């Protein structure tokens, strides 16, 4: 057994039993245990919690290592989940029995569906979340998950051993070394380090090492990864100051109320925990030219903006927006942080100016003329000497300005679609370490990494979601084939097959696979998904079988704009496509076969959606089949693109293929710089190789048959 100590050499260590100070044991026994797990997850953020619980659901003995147990479930930035594209990820995480959707249904204070003006394929489920309630509910779930142990500790290094010969990679991870020198061993390790890899907080011209305000960064682990040969990049993000609710003049602002009824994130919930009338509103205001003036006059005091490090394109700081789009008004959403919280989160005002300038800027905005910046609950500051409007203090009533965070990430083209790294076997990455931004993107990667880390332990095939199966598949495929040079955010526009990959049908796409192929889905959820699938198929069949003349339909449903000029019979499924018609009105017109389909609200709504997209879905399914054929053509894992001579590829293409190591022809075709001609040549090579291999296998079978026949003949003689 060996471990890598971040200094470029292999050091032998002995395997010893050791008792660890566990935050929670997965059994009643308190006896000392050998520190060996199936899966170790490093980091207790949104990716880490999903990864740890997914691995445990798959049957793996899992250890979650986090700096502080009391920060599990902490929403470090915005108090919201979901949105356009992100809401799809939430539904898919839930379809695989993930946590965040169910926890949001128990913790929200304002639920709304975005993009309602467009079709249901691109609706974005979103919720404002009570930070305190979310953290409580998440910790309760984590600390009561069977097979999952939680331990406080920081990881300094990785324990590495010789690689498995049947897999690519120069070594294999077999555990971790903590900062106190103790070791924990495992069959698979998942890194979900968020912004902690060499994290640096920035306010004005001041910087301080931290992965998040109040938490130390991970330096040793970052150095280890770099020395192992991983390509490391640098990204940045930021968060706005928090404002005292009582100091805001809401009466002059645009008020936005939640939806009624509220749509839950989870397929297992019919409603959310709180009634619409008890939910909190959000408010909208805008910046003005005075804000632009403050930003432009003080750029010399803002090192974060001057950095060449790339920040999030779709959630930029106010300084970046002013520089990129001068002389414009920018939206500022005032979002509640909880039912009992006196804090308001100003979405759109992420900034890193010195503290006194931040307050000056905020009071220039309509409704915020008397706004007071205060510190969020639960923040333990590690910046005793950073001067920001005096001194930053841990006292709640003193101001805490917005700040930026710069951190390391690893080029995601160094991981496979299962999120295992090419360089180190059984090492998985998930979340911001792969260059993404957002809770939802992190959670989606976390659940896939947890599943595959567990499957790797049991030597089962990886669980890969393709671009044709889910937004998760698009997210991971974009990362592993295209890479990213800025924080990656999910949008519906990134998805080719949006009409098939809708929020309403994520369970049909992923729950059945998750149960059969990964074992990460509970029996109860699986049975519910099977019932919904069979009910939809039966309902569509019944709707297709009911036919009347258009004149009769017009009499039965007079509110529908049905043309009576058609002479041919019209199916009930076609009538359901009209905007004015739903399953309730159809059931009133034809109660006998249709009434039972209105008893479940979700079933009735999904039948309406299926009817709406029936014709276009048929054509899209044909396109999906073509893509799936390309994805089915697997490339050899041990193919050396730099040296193979049987295929004509340019040096540039060889380098790109060597770096990204695509697993299929389809993935190779999406790598920038890999030409169509190169794909054709690669396709020919793969098919020729497959034919040769098949011929060799047949020849081997024939030889074996002849040998067996000779032996049989000798016995008879």
Swiss-Prot record:
Modification N6-methyllysine, positions: 533
Expression by tissue: Ubiquitously expressed in various tissues, but with a markedly elevated expression in tissues of high metabolic rates including cochlea.
Lineage: Eukaryota, Metazoa, Chordata, Craniata, Vertebrata
Function: Component of the GTPBP3-MTO1 complex that catalyzes the 5-taurinomethyluridine (taum(5)U) modification at the 34th wobble position (U34) of mitochondrial tRNAs (mt-tRNAs), which plays a role in mt-tRNA decoding and mitochondrial translation. Taum(5)U formation on mammalian mt-tRNA requires the presence of both GTPBP3-mediated GTPase activity and MTO1 catalytic activity.
Keyword Mitochondrion applies: yes
Protein name: 5-taurinomethyluridine-[tRNA] synthase subunit MTO1, mitochondrial
Molecular function in Gene Ontology: flavin adenine dinucleotide binding; RNA binding; tRNA 5-taurinomethyluridine synthase activity
Gene, per the UniProt record: MTO1
Catalytically driven reaction(s): 5,10-methylenetetrahydrofolate + uridine(34) in tRNA + taurine + GTP + A + H2O = 5-taurinomethyluridine(34) in tRNA + 7,8-dihydrofolate + GDP + AH2 + phosphate + H(+)
Cofactor names: FAD
The keyword Glycoprotein is assigned to this record: no
Membership in a protein family: Belongs to the MnmG family.
Disease: Combined oxidative phosphorylation deficiency 10: An autosomal recessive disorder resulting in variable defects of mitochondrial oxidative respiration. Affected individuals present in infancy with hypertrophic cardiomyopathy and lactic acidosis. The severity is variable, but can be fatal in the most severe cases.
PROSITE patterns, per the entry: GIDA_1, GIDA_2
Keywords: Cardiomyopathy, Disease variant, FAD, Flavoprotein, Methylation, Mitochondrion, Primary mitochondrial disease, Transit peptide, tRNA processing
GO BP, sorted A to Z: mitochondrial tRNA wobble uridine modification; tRNA methylation
Stored InterPro entries: FAD/NAD-bd_sf, GIDA_C_N, MnmG-rel, MnmG-rel_CS, MnmG_C, MnmG_C_subdom, MnmG_C_subdom_sf, MnmG_N
Residues involved in FAD binding: 43-48, 155, 218, 432
Cellular component, GO annotation: cytosol; mitochondrion; transferase complex
Transit peptide: 1-25
Quaternary structure and partners: Homodimer; forms a dimer in the presence of potassium. Interacts with GTPBP3; forms the GTPBP3-MTO1 complex composed of homodimers of GTPBP3 and MTO1.
Cell compartment(s), UniProt: Mitochondrion
Provenance organism: Homo sapiens (Human)
